[in-house]
Design a protein with these regions (language model features):
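Bacterial N-terminal signal peptides
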Residues: 10-22
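Bacterial N-terminal signal peptides that target proteins for export
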Residues: 1-13
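N-terminal pro-sequences and low-complexity stem/linker regions of secreted or lumenal proteins
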Residues: 28-652
Length: 652
C-alpha cells in the first residue's frame, strides 16, 4: 500500500520534473549522430553494402573469424555508461513521460516524499570511483518493479534506499545510496569505451540473462543458463530465497564448491583465501552439473576427455547423454581459455600490503564461471584451461594461442597488474579502488577501461587480429537505473522472474565489424554463447538431450517453455552476427586495420581524469548536452556513502 501511494504521488510530480528538464521542447531538435572525422573515412557507403542472407553472412563470418575474445567486465547498466550516447536507445531518446522510470520516488531524511530522475556525474564527482549499489536478486527484482508481468523500472532509488533504512525515515547514507543508483557517466569518465562505440558496433538491447549479481552472469556467459536444467532434473535442489539459499538456478554470489573448505578432492583448485577468513565466510554453492561451452567445444574428443574426471560419477551424472551426443557429432575440438586475474601468479602478487595472502589475493573466486562445474575443476585436461591475467598478455605477445583458433575469456580482479592508481587523491580511494574489472566498490572505471584497452591493443598488435572478434560486455547491470523493460523469459522456484534482467552494454570489435553502428538486436548473455555456437558449428546447448529433458519437465510441471539454456529455442536472443559488416565480409571493403582498433599509449598509461581526455577531445557530444539538458547531482549526493561517509562527499 505504501509503494502504491508513493507511485501515485510520483505521478503527480512527474510532469513537473520533466518540464523542468526541458525535455518536451528540447527533443524536437534533431540529434547529431555522425561519426568523428577520423572514423568517417572507414564508413562503407550504403550502396556498397551487399544484401546477404543469414546463411551467407554466417558462412562469411566463419571464413574470416577464428579467434573470439570475450573481455568480460563487471556491473554496469547500459544507461549508466551509454545512456547519452548519440543514436542509442538511451535516457533521453523519448520524452520523459514516455521513459520508464524517468521519475522515481525517493524519501527525504525527514520522511517526506521526494522524486529523483537520472543525473550525470563526471570528473568533478570523481565518478570513476563509486560505491557498490545493491544488485542481489531480491533487490534488483524490486528495483525493476514488476506489476502484472510488466517491469516498470521505477524503484531503483527507493529499493536501494530501503535496503539501508527498511522502515521510517531513511538515514543520510540510505538516501545517498538511493541517489547513487540513478547516476550515469559519459565520455568524460569512460572515453575509451565511447571511442570503441564510435569506431565499432555498440549493441543497445542486450540484457543480463539472470536477475541477480555477478556469479549468475559468469555462469550464463559459458552455459546460457545458471542451473534451470539442474533444478528441473533435481527439484530438491531448488532455492526459495534467492539471496540466501544455495541451490538452482544460481541467483547469488556463493563461492564455488571446488577450492572451498568443503571441497573433498585432494588437489584443490585456486581460491582467494580471504573468502573464508573472518566471521562471515562466503557461502558455498552446489556443484553445477549442466552442459556448458567447454563440453561442446571439446567436440568428438569429449568422451575421451571426460575419462580424466576424478569424480565422474557425480560430475557427469546430468550430462551423460550430452557427452555421447557431442562425441557422436563429429566436429573437431575448439580450444578455449578462461584468463582471470589472480587465478595463478601475477606480477603484482605480494606487492600491495593489503594483499597479505600473496598469490590469489587479487582473485575473485565467485567470478570464475568454469570453476563451479565439477567436470571442469576435477578434470586436469579441462582445469588446465583456467589461467591468470598475465598469462593472457604473455600468450598474445608470444603468439602461443592455439593455431586453429578458439574462445578466450578475459577478466580482471581486485587489483590491476599494471600498477595504475586512481586519480582521486583521497586515501580511502587510493587504498580500495585499485581493481580493473569495473566493479564499483573496489574497481576504478578508468583503470578498468585501461585494462580493456591494453587487451584490445595487444590483440591488435598480435598475429590474431586479422581473424579476431572481440566482445566487450558486462556480467550484470550493478543495480543502476536502466529504463528499458527486459523480456520475460523465465520464472524461478518462488515465482519471481529470473530472466531477463536490465540491459548491459556490449561492444563488438573486429576487422569485419560495422563502423559507427548502434545495433538494436535483442539478446542477453546467452547471445555470446549463441555466437560461439554459430561460428564454430557447435550443437546449441539447448539442443542437447539432457537439457531437452529438463525443458520438457519445465513445460509439463511449471508451464514454462524456456526452462533451459537460452542459446536456442528461446525468443529474443540474437546471435550478434548483425554487428558484422557485409561489405567487409564479402571483400567489397577492406578489413579494418589494427591501427584503427588501437588506443594510443598516452591515453592508456595515464588516466582521463589526469589528462583531461574526454568528450571534447573525442568530438562526441552526448545527447543530454545536445538537448540542452544539464542535470546536477542532488545537494547531498555522495559517490561513496560507505567508503567515505559524509553529508556531501565530492560534489560538482
Amino acid at each position: 500500500m505504501f509503494v502504491r501511494r508513493l507511485a501515485a504521488l510520483v505521478g503527480a510530480t512527474a510532469l513537473g520534473l520533466v518540464a523542468a528538464l526541458g525535455l518536451v521542447a528540447a527533443q524536437a531538435a534533431p540529434l547529431r549522430t555522425a561519426p568523428t572525422p577520423d572514423v568517417r573515412a572507414y564508413l562503407v557507403p550504403v550502396a556498397r553494402e551487399p544484401g546477404l542472407t543469414a546463411a551467407q553472412r554466417l558462412a562469411l563470418v566463419r571464413r574470416h573469424i577464428k579467434y573470439v575474445f570475450v573481455l568480460y567486465q563487471e556491473n554496469r547498466s547500459f544507461d549508466s555508461y551509454f545512456g547519452t550516447y548519440p543514436g542509442a536507445d538511451g535516457i533521453y531518446s523519448r520524452p520523459g513521460v514516455a521513459t520508464p522510470g524517468f521519475v522515481q520516488p525517493i524519501l527525504n531524511t525527514d520522511g517526506t516524499l521526494g522524486t529523483i530522475g537520472p543525473f550525470r556525474i563526471g570528473p568533478a564527482q570523481f565518478a570513476a570511483d563509486t560505491d557498490d549499489v545493491d544488485h542481489s536478486h531480491d533487490i534488483l527484482f524490486r528495483k525493476m518493479d514488476i506489476e502484472a508481468g510488466h517491469a516498470l523500472m521505477d524503484h531503483f532509488a527507493l529499493a536501494e534506499e530501503r535496503k539501508y533504512s527498511p522502515h521510517g525515515k531513511p538515514s543520510l547514507k540510505a538516501k545517498q545510496f538511493g541517489e547513487l543508483a540513478m547516476a550515469y557517466e559519459d565520455c568524460d569518465t569512460v572515453p575509451i569505451l565511447w571511442r570503441y562505440a564510435d569506431r565499432f558496433a555498440l549493441y543497445d538491447h542486450i540484457f543480463q540473462e539472470i536477475v541477480g549479481p555477478s556469479t549468475p552472469g559468469n555462469l550464463s556467459i559459458i552455459a546460457a543458463q545458471t542451473g534451470v536444467t539442474q533444478w528441473m532434473l533435481h527439484p530438491a535442489a531448488a532455492w526459495w530465497d534467492a539471496n540466501h539459499d544455495l541451490g538452482e538456478p544460481v541467483a547469488n554470489d556463493a563461492d564455488p564448491l571446488w577450492g572451498s573448505p568443503r571441497d573433498p578432492t585432494a588437489h584443490k583448485i585456486a581460491v582467494n583465501a580471504h573468502d573464508f577468513a573472518g566471521a562471515h565466510p562466503y557461502p558455498i554453492q552446489l556443484n553445477q552439473t549442466y552442459a556448458s561451452l567447454p563440453l561442446t567445444l571439446a567436440g568428438r574428443s569429449l568422451p575421451g576427455v571426460v575419462t580424466q574426471d576424478t569424480r565422474a560419477a557425480t560430475d557427469l551424472a546430468d550430462v551423460r547423454q550430452d557427452v555421447a551426443a557431442i562425441g557422436h557429432g563429429g566436429h573437431a575440438a575448439v580450444d578455449w581459455r578462461w584468463f582471470e586475474e589472480g587465478f595463478d601468479h601475477e606480477p603484482t602478487d605480494s606487492v600491495d600490503p593489503t594483499d597479505a595472502t600473496g598469490q590469489h589475493a587479487s582473485y575473485i573466486t565467485h567470478h570464475n564461471g568454469p570453476q563451479y562445474f565439477g567436470y571442469i575443476a576435477n578434470n586436469p585436461v579441462m582445469r588446465a584451461k583456467l589461467r591468470g591475467l598475465a598469462d593472457f598478455f604473455a600468450a598474445l605477445k608470444g603468439g602461443t594461442l592455439p593455431a586453429a583458433g578458439g574462445v578466450f575469456y578475459v577478466k580482471g580482479g581486485y587489483d590491476n597488474i599494471f600498477g595504475l592508481k586512481p586519480a582521486d587523491p583521497a586515501a580511502a580511494v587510493q587504498r580500495r579502488f585499485l581493481g580493473d574489472d569495473d566493479h564499483p566498490g573496489y574497481s576504478d572505471a578508468e583503470i578498468s577501461e585501461a585494462m580493456v584497452a591494453r587487451a584490445v591493443n595487444a590483440i591488435a598488435a598480435s598475429r590474431y587480429w586479422k581473424q579476431a572478434a572481440i566482445i566487450i560486455t558486462w556480467d550484470d547491470s550493478e543495480g543502476d537505473y536502466d529504463h528499458v523493460p527486459p523480456p520475460a523469459l523465465q520464472y524461478g522456484p518462488n515465482g519471481d522472474r529470473i530472466s531477463d534482467g536490465p540491459r548491459v552494454p556490449l561492444l563488438l570489435i573486429s576487422p569485419y565489424a560495422r563502423v559507427h553502428a548502434v545495433v538494436h538486436a535483442v539478446g542477453n548473455h546467452a547471445s555470446v554463447v549463441k555466437f560461439v555456437d554459430a561460428l564454430f558449428a557447435l550443437p546449441p546447448l539447448a539442443s542437447l538431450p539432457d537439457e531437452l529433458e529438463g525443458r520438457k519437465i519445465g513445460r509439463l510441471r511449471f508451464h514454462q517453455a524456456n526452462l533451459g539454456p537460452e542459446d536456442a529455442l528461446t525468443p529474443d536472443v540474437t546471435d550478434l552476427l548483425s554487428g558484422f559488416d557485409a561489405a567487409r565480409l564479402s571483400g567489397r571493403a577492406a578489413p579494418l586495420p589494427p591501427s584503427y582498433a588501437e588506443t594510443p599509449a598516452r591515453l592508456v598509461d595515464r588516466l582521463p581524469a589526469v589528462t583531461g581526455y574526454g568528450c571534447k577531445a573525442l568530438g562526441i557530444v552526448p545527447v543530454d548536452a545536445q538537448l540542452g539538458i544539464h542535470t546536477t547531482p542532488p545537494a547531498d549526493f555522495n559517490p561513496r556513502p560507505k567508503t567515505e561517509p559524509s553529508p556531501g562527499g565530492h560534489r560538482g
